[in-house]
Amino acid sequence: MKKLSFQQIILTLQNYWQDYGCAILQPYDAHVGAGTFHPATVLRCLGTKPWSVAYVQPSRRPGDSRYGMHPNRMQHYYQFQVILKPSPDNIQELYLKSLECLGIDLKIHDIRFVEDDWESPTLGAAGLGWEVWCNGMEVSQFTYMQQIGGIECRPVAGEITYGLERLALYIQGVDEVRELDWSGQVGEKALKYGEVDFEAEGQFSKYNLELADSEMLLRHFKDSEDQCERLIKANLPMPAYDECLKASHAFNQLNALGVISVTERASYVLRVRHLARICCTKWLEMNK
């Protein structure tokens, strides 16, 4: 079987979950640290209304900046997120079938579910979870979402997060993300991952670790915090959640710069968690 390109992996997963019955959503247009932060997960996992969606989410983690020199760690990467609410009884079987669609033979390869309960302190979210390893390399995270914004999820949603770069490294049999086949084309049309993203990776790493203005980021954090509180009072939880995301990203940038002490870090986490909680609480009040 021909090895899938990076974009073919995405298209295959989209088609698989669309055939299952998921709505295929688009990435959220905000700086987020993971696909979980998309409001399609944070807000829609709350309440009783069924919700089945899948989407790609570009994600940013300033603390993982490596100037494009690390084989598989970047400050910008892609996740494929699936949310099934309520979680079906056969969710693990559905996941394994999706791997087969990507050309991974389950009879040959060692697929293991390694217990790893998931928690996001800034979102006030947690759930029973497993890392999914393929021949010793983590390729996905599997979680029963039990709490978001400090609110219990009833019913529990099933969350599957595919690490697209790691999955592609395994499928294509290469050692470095920059060498991944992005497009599946040959000749002049051939395109590698590094040609798409790695110039930006180097520049954003320099910004994240050397040039970001900490005083400006502190102001941005406080401004977003204040704006979030104001929007909640105006019964506008969705734009308020955008401000929560801005505060979260500013915190991540400050953390990457190394200007926040351990004590201060705990305080900032609690402040972002408070914003997430009031957004979730208000959204749930308005969508019962």
UniProtKB/Swiss-Prot annotation:
The keyword Manganese does not apply. It is found in: Cytoplasm. Its EC number is 6.1.1.14. Gene3D superfamilies: Bira Bifunctional Protein, Domain 2, Class II aaRS and biotin synthetases, domain 2. Keywords: Aminoacyl-tRNA synthetase, ATP-binding, Cytoplasm, Ligase, Nucleotide-binding, Protein biosynthesis. GO terms for biological process: glycyl-tRNA aminoacylation. GO terms for molecular function: ATP binding; glycine-tRNA ligase activity. It catalyses: tRNA(Gly) + glycine + ATP = glycyl-tRNA(Gly) + AMP + diphosphate. InterPro entries: aa-tRNA-synth_II/BPL/LPL, Gly-tRNA-synth_heterodimer, Gly-tRNA_ligase_asu. It holds the Pfam family tRNA-synt_2e. Belongs to the class-II aminoacyl-tRNA synthetase family. Tetramer of two alpha and two beta subunits. NCBIfam families: glyQ, PRK09348.1. PANTHER family: GLYCINE--TRNA LIGASE, CHLOROPLASTIC_MITOCHONDRIAL 2 (PTHR30075:SF2), GLYCYL-TRNA SYNTHETASE (PTHR30075). This is Glycine--tRNA ligase alpha subunit.
